[in-house]
Amino acid sequence: MYATSKKNINLALFDFDGTLCKKDSFTGFIFYALSKRHIVKQGLKILPWIQAYYLNIYPANSMRPKLYRAMFSGADTSEIQQLAKEYAQHLMSQLDPQLYQQLLDHQEQGDDVVLVSASIDIYLQLICDLLNIDLICTGTEIIHHQFTGNYSTPDCSSEQKKYRILERYNIDKY
């Protein structure tokens, strides 16, 4: 999504999951980075919420932090970050070709390009570094080289996306 500007520079905002990337990258990262045994063991602990989510009675913005905490709480950052590098490279090959070209066109025109996503920074920051674009997403908390299982920012979905965009960018500039 972008708005054409009369001031010669545009703010081009791209969503990730289901848009620039055709799949759910967060769930994909869980299966990429963690053992099946760990996923099953931790998944059983939050099974009622998973079921409620799939029955559309528990919202995604509540499910994501619960799932993140169950899967990554106490995980070693160096191990997960190495897997995130590999996963980011994998996702780069999965980008929607037409939208990726739009992104490149915006960069070529000198526009400010931003990825705005409810997914987590662990792998999205690496993707944005590779694409040389800015990132607004859900941050993850690290203490003593371990993921705490908590977010360092609110879940970046719905109204939070709008709030975070307006917080970081002066829309009058575009």
Give the location of each predicted region.
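C-terminal cap/substrate-recognition subdomain and adjoining C-terminal extension
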Residues: M1-A3, I9, Q89-Y174
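Active-site neighborhood of HAD-like aspartate-dependent phosphohydrolases
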Residues: Y2-N56
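Residue-level signature of catalytic and energy-coupling elements of molecular machines
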Residues: G18, I80, S117
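A general structural signal for well-ordered alpha-helical segments in protein cores
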Residues: F26-T27, R64, K162
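Conserved alpha/beta cores of soluble small-molecule-handling proteins
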Residues: H38-I39, Y58, T77-E79, P97-Q98, ...
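Short, compositionally biased "basic patch" segments
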Residues: Q51-T77, C128-T140
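Metal-dependent phosphoesterase signature
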Residues: M63-Q98
